[in-house]
């Protein structure tokens, strides 16, 4: 049985100082992604590609450890991130795990705005065969929402600080 669940978050960050330089800052893809995600969990895989180890979590006493290859590009002033490939450690051999990530971030007249969609489809693990599908999907939705909220919180705290550091470094 295939389980599917997703979560979505929007972001609006007010930036008052040097906001005219936000578009240039977003061109620093590696730096921006490092500020948005935990840079210690990012491994560069080439230009515009990183492998990211998502913070592990427990679901029904199972340790879950997603690893995602992420493509990053700045297109028309919008920083876009998407999942290229993903693996799931912690549930034994799962061949049909599919993670969808679509996120964007752009400079606006108020500061930075963006949104992220995170989705998963996976077959029901044998260890969870007795748990009803609705409960598993509801739990999955909550977990994904928690991941996105954690990233959103980090972005709200870290991204503006990193932007101001970047401005200082570039004597803006």
Residue ranges and their predicted role:
Residues 64-111:
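Hydrophobic-ligand binding "helix-grip"
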Residues 2-8, 47, 65, 96-98, ...:
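A general secondary-structure signal for short beta-strands and their flanking turns/coil
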Residues 8-14, 53, 69-73, 100-106, ...:
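Residue-level recognition of well-ordered beta-strand positions that form the cores
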Residues 91-141:
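Beta-strand/loop substructures that line and gate deep hydrophobic ligand-binding cavities in soluble
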């Amino acid at each position: 049985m295939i389980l599917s669940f997703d979560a979505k978050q929007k972001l609006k960050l007010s930036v008052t100082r040097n906001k005219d330089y936000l578009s240039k800052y977003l061109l620093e893809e590696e730096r921006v992604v490092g500020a948005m995600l935990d840079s210690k969990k990012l491994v560069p895989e080439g230009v515009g590609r990183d492998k990211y180890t998502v913070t592990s979590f427990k679901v029904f006493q199972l340790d879950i450890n997603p690893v995602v290859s992420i493509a990053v590009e700045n297109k028309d002033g919008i920083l876009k991130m998407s999942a290229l490939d993903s693996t799931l450690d912690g549930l034994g051999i799962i061949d049909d795990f599919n993670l969808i990530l679509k996120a964007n971030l752009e400079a606006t007249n108020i500061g930075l705005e963006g949104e992220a969609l995170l989705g998963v489809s996976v077959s029901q693990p044998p260890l969870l065969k007795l748990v009803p599908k609705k409960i598993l999907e509801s739990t999955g939705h909550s977990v994904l929402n928690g991941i996105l909220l954690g990233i959103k919180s980090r972005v709200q705290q870290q991204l503006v600080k990193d932007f101001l550091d970047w401005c200082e470094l570039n004597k803006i």
